[in-house]
Amino acid sequence: MKTIIVFLSLLVLATKFGDANEGVNQEQMKEVIQNEFREDFLNEMAPMSLLQQLEAIESTLLEKEADRNSRQKRCNGKNVPCGSNHSPCCSGLSCEETFGYGWLYKSPYCVIPSNG
């Protein structure tokens, strides 16, 4: 019976002092949670800012590529009919009436430009 009284008194004392320290513990827990939240927030923001930077770089590169028209449109090669009904000649070729094919098919052909 004496041991039960001793344990009950210890329980009451622990509860009383536990409540007194609980306010301090709650403040410490709030600080820890806030610090962890800040670290998590900063850790999440770092990849997001990196992602935003990469997207900005990618968009500028795509704009440059779109501005310079890096891909050539479909064109006709050498000795292929050209004109208003056909695709334009590729770079380095010109659409000219030729003696070889033009008189037979009655259309100009893509040929290497003459210097004369």
Curated annotation (Swiss-Prot):
Species in which this protein is naturally found: Trittame loki
Assigned protein family: Belongs to the neurotoxin 14 (magi-1) family. 06 (ICK-Trit) subfamily.
Tissue occurrence: Expressed by the venom gland.
Protein name: U16-barytoxin-Tl1c
Propeptide residues per the UniProt entry: 21-76
Cystine connections: 75-90, 82-95, 89-110
Keyword Chaperone on entry: no
A GO CC term attached to the entry: extracellular region
Subcellular location: Secreted
Pfam families: Toxin_22
Function of the protein: Ion channel inhibitor.
Single annotated GO MF: sodium channel inhibitor activity
Free-text comment on this protein's domains from its UniProt entry: The presence of a 'disulfide through disulfide knot' structurally defines this protein as a knottin.
